[in-house]
């Protein structure tokens, strides 16, 4: 059996998952990152995408996250998401509302903030294409 570690996915609204995991794939801003037991200590920012968790009991859980930070230690990983939802609970309306909110914020934005919001909208659009069937 593979080594396991403690994983927690937390959003401002609630604790979404606290489990013993064998592998977690995180959509880090530098690219997808796979976390396993005894991982080197790392902190990374998280972009909108899908977090895939393989639990120690063999289940696979998928969550859509909308940005955040991951704190990775050899004994565990905590992902603090700006917002997150289980993929099974994500629907087109939720995603379209998030995109509309970002577009509204884009109207008054300039320079670097405008670029960040445009990138966020692109990431949300891609996320929708990945997890929501047409």
From Swiss-Prot:
InterPro entries: ATP_synth_F1_dsu/esu (IPR001469), ATP_synth_F1_dsu/esu_N (IPR020546), ATPsynth_dsu/esu_N (IPR036771). It is found in: Cell inner membrane. One of its GO terms (cellular component) is plasma membrane. The keyword Iron-sulfur does not apply. Coiled coil: none annotated. F-type ATPases have 2 components, CF(1) - the catalytic core - and CF(0) - the membrane proton channel. CF(1) has five subunits: alpha(3), beta(3), gamma(1), delta(1), epsilon(1). CF(0) has three main subunits: a, b and c. This is ATP synthase epsilon chain. It comes from Sinorhizobium fredii (strain NBRC 101917 / NGR234).
């Amino acid at each position: 059996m593979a080594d396991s570690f403690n994983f927690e996915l937390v959003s401002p609204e609630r604790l979404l998952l606290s489990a013993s995991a064998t592998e977690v794939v995180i959509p880090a801003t530098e690219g997808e990152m796979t976390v396993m037991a005894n991982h080197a200590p790392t902190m990374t920012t998280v972009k909108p995408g899908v977090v895939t968790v393989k639990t120690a009991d063999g289940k696979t859980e998928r969550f859509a996250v909308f940005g955040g930070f991951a704190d990775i230690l050899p004994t565990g990983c905590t992902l603090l998401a700006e917002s997150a939802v289980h993929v099974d609970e994500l629907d087109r309306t939720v995603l379209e509302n998030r995109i509309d909110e970002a577009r509204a914020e884009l109207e008054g934005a300039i320079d670097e903030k405008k670029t960040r919001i445009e990138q966020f909208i692109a990431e949300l659009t891609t996320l929708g294409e990945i997890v929501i069937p047409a």
